[in-house]
């Protein structure tokens, strides 16, 4: 996948322009180019090399991840600095995708979590229907600082499996870009072979560590008395007079205590109860549950994962065609981030969770 540069496009436009160049035009172009350069400067590009079976699928999958700038199929960590598709069995290279990503948008540990979703990490020299050493799994790095991050994620992954994790972790060597035929193969051949489900890229990973819980003193300084009372003391605000009960603008609702994303406007509906109501959280992991026996009733309390904040309750009287649940949430427990502000507020990776 190759990215075009705005600066190049602007230069082409200027060279073809038939209008006279004025001071104002020059000023406008200069400002545009400066903004473009600033945008480029804000990027923190980094590379990691991922082997996970046939590189057609891994390349197409990684290109769909928010924050990935480029993905190129190639061959890595073989015995020689020359090879090709016909010789990789002899040179012992692994089919590997060079992933260039913006660390301001996606961290390496999160990128690896996406990678783990589409491989069998305990399999040796086999992924999907593909067999052979060239289909082994591997994470190859150039920056030595990446090694500890990779090893930490591998250790966490091992805790989920009984069998030993077989992912090769090594410094990168002998990387060779694959033939043009293999680049963007699934774009050129939409019905071509792919051993993974590319739709898994749409499952958003929300990392709890990105949204740490503040201390109680910090919460008291940060929250309004109502927000603190609701989230920390499990109180309930008044219906029909709270901030978001009738808000149906596109955006997300985040934990007011930590900023962790919780709900999407796409899943919000008018329930008639007077509080914001949702059919589900953005992902199932961002909330937890416990029985609530207060007021001589048995209800299921909804609690934010990272902040451990009281959010509200979940009931089974929601829309049947959307799962039948109604998450009844206090406005005071959440903060609304409009769709147009999500990138600016570092929630750009969730825009697809909002758009219909």
Swiss-Prot record:
MF terms in GO: L-methionine:thioredoxin-disulfide S-oxidoreductase activity; peptide-methionine (R)-S-oxide reductase activity; peptide-methionine (S)-S-oxide reductase activity
PROSITE patterns (UniProt xref): MSRB (PS51790)
Cysteine disulfide partners in this protein: none
Domain MsrB: start-end pairs: 216-339
Sequence segments annotated as region (Peptide methionine sulfoxide reductase A): 46-199
NCBIfam families assigned to the protein according to its UniProt record, in alphabetical order: msrA, peptide-methionine (R)-S-oxide reductase MsrB
GO biological process: protein modification process; protein repair; response to oxidative stress
Species this protein is from: Aggregatibacter actinomycetemcomitans (Actinobacillus actinomycetemcomitans)
UniProt-recorded name of the protein: Peptide methionine sulfoxide reductase MsrA/MsrB
């Amino acid at each position: 996948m190759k990215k075009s540069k705005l600066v190049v496009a602007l230069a082409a436009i200027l060279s073809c322009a038939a209008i006279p160049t004025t001071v104002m035009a020059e000023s406008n172009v200069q400002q545009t180019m400066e903004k473009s350069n600033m945008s480029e400067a804000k990027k923190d590009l980094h590379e990691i090399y991922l082997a996970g079976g046939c590189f057609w699928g891994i390349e197409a999958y990684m290109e769909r991840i928010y924050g990935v700038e480029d993905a190129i199929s190639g061959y890595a960590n073989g015995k020689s600095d020359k090879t090709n598709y016909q010789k990789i069995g002899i040179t012992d290279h692994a089919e590997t995708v060079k992933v260039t990503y913006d660390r301001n948008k996606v961290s390496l540990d999160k990128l690896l979590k996406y990678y783990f979703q589409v491989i069998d990490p305990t399999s040796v020299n086999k992924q999907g229907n593909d067999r052979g050493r060239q289909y082994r799994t591997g994470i190859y790095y150039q920056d030595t600082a990446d090694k500890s991050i990779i090893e930490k994620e591998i250790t966490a992954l091992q805790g989920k499996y009984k069998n030993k994790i077989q992912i090769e972790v090594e410094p990168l060597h002998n990387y060779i870009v694959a033939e043009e035929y293999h680049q963007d193969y699934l774009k050129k051949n939409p019905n071509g072979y792919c051993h993974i489900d590319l739709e898994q890229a749409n499952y958003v990973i929300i990392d709890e560590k990105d949204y740490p819980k503040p201390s109680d003193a910090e919460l008291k300084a940060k929250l309004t008395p109502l927000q603190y009372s609701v989230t920390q003391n499990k109180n309930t605000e008044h219906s029909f007079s709270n901030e978001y009960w009738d808000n149906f603008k596109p955006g997300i609702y985040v934990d007011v205590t930590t900023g962790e994303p919780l709900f999407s406007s796409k899943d919000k509906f008018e329930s008639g109860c007077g509080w914001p109501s949702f059919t589900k959280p953005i992902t199932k992991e961002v909330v937890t549950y416990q029985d609530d026996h207060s007021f001589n009733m048995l209800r299921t309390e909804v609690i934010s994962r990272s902040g451990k904040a009281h959010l509200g309750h979940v009931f089974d009287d929601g829309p049947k065609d959307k799962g039948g649940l109604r998450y009844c949430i206090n406005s005071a427990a959440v903060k609304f981030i409009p769709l147009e502000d999500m990138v600016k507020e570092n929630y750009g990776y969730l825009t697809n969770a909002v758009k219909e």
